[in-house]
Amino acid sequence: MKSNIRVRFAPSPTGPLHIGGLRTALYNYLFAKKNNGVFILRIEDTDQSRYVSNAEEYITDALDWCNIPFDEGPGKNEKFGPYRQSERKELYREYVDILIEKDKAYYAFDTSEELNTHRKQHEAAGKTFIYNWHNREKGRLKNSLVLTKEETKKKIEEGSNYVIRFKSPQDETLVLNDEIRGVITIDSNTLDDKVLFKSDGMPTYHLANIVDDHLMKISHVIRGEEWLPSMPLHVLLYNAFGWETPNFAHLPLILKPEGKGKLSKRDGDKLGFPVFPLEYTNEQTSEVSTGYRESGYFPDALINMLSLLGWNPGTEQELFTLEGLISSFGLSRVSKSGARFSLDKTKWFNQQYLQKKTDEQLAELYLTVLKTKNIQRLPSIDYIKS
């Protein structure tokens, strides 16, 4: 175990926080607090085309409601800030230039139309087009590996659109270790040369993610299973920079109640239950999605339920306080396989917490619900308790 534990929850502000993302935040928080570490919130907003203006506020409100406070983040203890990637734009250019100088990255000028033509030609021949060592230097593609330095410089000065790609190694066997999934072996010849940076001055997720994790001294990257395919590239990037690699842990998916397929944001009210901690209003369509808070659920009940969706305490115990979760949690008991969501079990947890509440606590909660629903004439606490 590394001595200084620093973990991060790094959502993209593209909409409301899904309960799968909330569980990722929770596991990071529990791991940090169990090991006297630091829990960081970082907003990964490099994809401005998908940016939603009220999403960051929603994320922080949801974490507040669930009692998962971050130690560092936007507007709070900004020791390694800024914590929004859009505010770190100039920084990423410096680091991609380092990769170019080390011959670990290169300029590519291929248009979308040209790349589509290559894909169709490969498909016609029963093959799959991969932009990597197999074809990057054979003259079919337009990049700085086949162009002279003068030709490359001229294209950039003329304003030609470009991307900067990572130069994946050839004929290497990558041996990766995941805290949950164990040892993973990858043939580097199967990897494509991912885009790291674009001519509009914005990095892609991969570059920004690695640079920020390094500069923020992240010790453990605990994230969803959907990022497992990115792990080889991320480890290669750490190696290319000559940086120490953090420990990785990829959490299992939260599955739909029938056990088939990931429980997604789109499932929401369609399946008859919330998939967001708080109610969310889409600013463009005015569509309202229900939340657990507005549906009468207690935050501690929701957190208790989510903690057991993928983690096993090793006992028959099901009800945990937040302090109990912190003392019991460990990555060694997180499952590799997906965890099925159960609405009945979620209701059961809420009922257990309801029974524990005092009359005074219930009265306070009742008033909060009325205020949330903009009911103006509120009864007094004494009236409710009577």
Where in this protein do the model-derived segments appear?
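Active-site-adjacent bridging/hinge elements
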Residues: 2-5, 34, 207-210, 274-280
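N-terminal Rossmann-like or analogous alpha/beta NTP/dinucleotide-binding catalytic cores
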Residues: 2-128, 229-240, 301
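Acidic, glycine-rich active-site loops and adjacent beta-strand->loop/helix elements
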Residues: 43-49, 225-227, 252-255, 346
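A generic structural motif
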Residues: 45-47, 215, 222, 353
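Catalytic cores of large soluble enzymes that bind and process phosphate-bearing ligands
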Residues: 51, 84-88, 104-107, 168, ...
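Alpha-helix initiation and N-capping motif
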Residues: 56, 89, 93, 112-115, ...
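Active-site cores that bind ATP or allylic diphosphates and position pyrophosphate for catalysis
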Residues: 106-107, 111-267, 274, 288, ...
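Catalytic adenosine-cofactor/nucleotide-binding cores of aminoacyl-tRNA synthetases and other
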Residues: 241-386
